[in-house]
């Protein structure tokens, strides 16, 4: 009995179009699960922002990276894939409903022109809960990619839900993710959780461009001394362990929190993520 999984020699008349071929040859490539953009949309690079657990500031980092790239003259966009806990519209002060036609939506724009799409822009009330099962949530994220008109986007940042469940898997498989940014906090336990996020990126063959440690320190307004409120940093050790080239630290700053609450994240100025943005530009 023959083994259907045994690779044969490449046929002489091979067209290299594996989608039309039933041969199990050595050159056969698995079918891609990536989904196309709708006609007329353009997204040059997709960067996923992930975390192993919630509450570490992933949406903040996503927003700040989008703002940084927009300031550098690129067209930035944010796809809010955190369907059950969306916070991107609040950070940017965007509250109007998304507009569109029968089978598509336009991305909303922030004050500085960043394109965003989030489930909160589609709900009758922003406080309505999204009580959906995993496959439905993952399907909604895919539709944000395929059914939204993205206008000449240079860098799209995907704000992922925490963990390694349905949505992260869907994003890695359905979108052409060029790189990952991992967000963490100083607690030592989080180092183990970060390992899971990094290992998932490795499993999906997507490079980790950098790690951002949020709430890394507090700077005393009187003496200027930095205090590690939540413990000493482990970010360099984690980065070295996984061979990740870039690290960044965000401070505990009431002004940043106030800007997010007021929908004015675009007014926050700081060079904390400059080196990471350089790496993203070079990707």
Regions found by a protein language model. Name each.
Residues 43, 54, 80, 88, ...:
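Residue-level signature of catalytic and energy-coupling elements of molecular machines
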Residues 75-77, 81-126, 131, 138:
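Phosphate-binding loop that captures ATP/GTP phosphates
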Residues 2-31, 198-283:
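C-terminal lobe/tail of nucleotide-utilizing enzymes
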Residues 38-44:
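Phosphate-binding P-loop
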Residues 117, 160, 173, 209, ...:
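Glycine-rich phosphate-binding loops of nucleotide-dependent enzymes
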Residues 151-158, 164-165, 176-197:
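Conserved Switch II/interswitch segment of TRAFAC-class P-loop GTPases
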Residues 45-83, 198:
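Walker A/P-loop phosphate-binding motif and the immediately C-terminal alpha-helix
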